[in-house]
């Protein structure tokens, strides 16, 4: 468990943020620019000191009021927006620098880091010859090799162009699946958060609006996320079948099975799906003579008005609503004509080609 409380003023900005999140997996601090995300991250690293603070990381106290463990005595890896590499050193020499800074036991080896981040071919190269995405991967590798108990990442993709972001995201997803250490990720990009985070801390104007599992936060009618035009549900599943003849994979998810384009193998691999709410339609019966491959039983939990004469319908997969959360954005007219009610069992139809899952980088 990570328990954090930080309060105080910095110039004209007042921070009063508190949250408790799991001591493993990826937690995203999400919110608009200037809401205090980076300030919280710097407090966790010990780089910013606010006397009204409290920080316990998996049973180890790093701050209790004015008793503050200095940064160099915290087992923290910090990845900045800009990859701050030593330009006079090679890639491998930058990584070795991280190893030399290690304070605790060996949690991850150089070989594991280079394999996870795909930087083996770069080891002999000068850092000046690297692309933006390659530089950031090396910076992450160096932070990991310092053997941290906590990895802090301050908008690690914000300085990259779209091509470089698309290059590095699959490697971050591999880290997410492989690392045991907790990661705190600062981001204002919801699509990035949906791909990487398990837990979401929603911040507004220096305060924490809410915190919890990302799927629950997306579907919470009391939070602003549910009103976003790019609303989507995040669903975790396990690959149970591959269909190479048609280029499809089948995932078992809580409450049903979903067919997805692409080879997401191997069998048994855990994958995360992003299901856009606008690509989910509802009916009372399973469709026939249709191109839609996914028709899953679901239960309506509730509905909220959305912009443009639309309705956002909150659902739970499964005949009894025992499965994963799902969201559908439908026209108000169709919703009223069909007379859907909370508690009613319906069939959720998902367009397979609209579903997206992480690209695989091998292994």
Curated annotation (Swiss-Prot):
GO terms for molecular function: ABC-type molybdate transporter activity; ATP binding; ATP hydrolysis activity. ATP binds at residues 31-38. It is found in: Cell inner membrane. It is a peripheral membrane protein. Keywords: ATP-binding, Cell inner membrane, Cell membrane, Membrane, Molybdenum, Nucleotide-binding, Translocase, Transport. It comes from the Bacteria. Residues 289-359 form the Mop domain. Pfam families: ABC_tran, TOBE. One of its GO terms (cellular component) is plasma membrane. Belongs to the ABC transporter superfamily. Molybdate importer (TC 3.A.1.8) family. Part of the ABC transporter complex ModABC involved in molybdenum import. Responsible for energy coupling to the transport system. This is Molybdenum import ATP-binding protein ModC. It comes from Rhodobacter capsulatus (Rhodopseudomonas capsulata). The gene is modC.
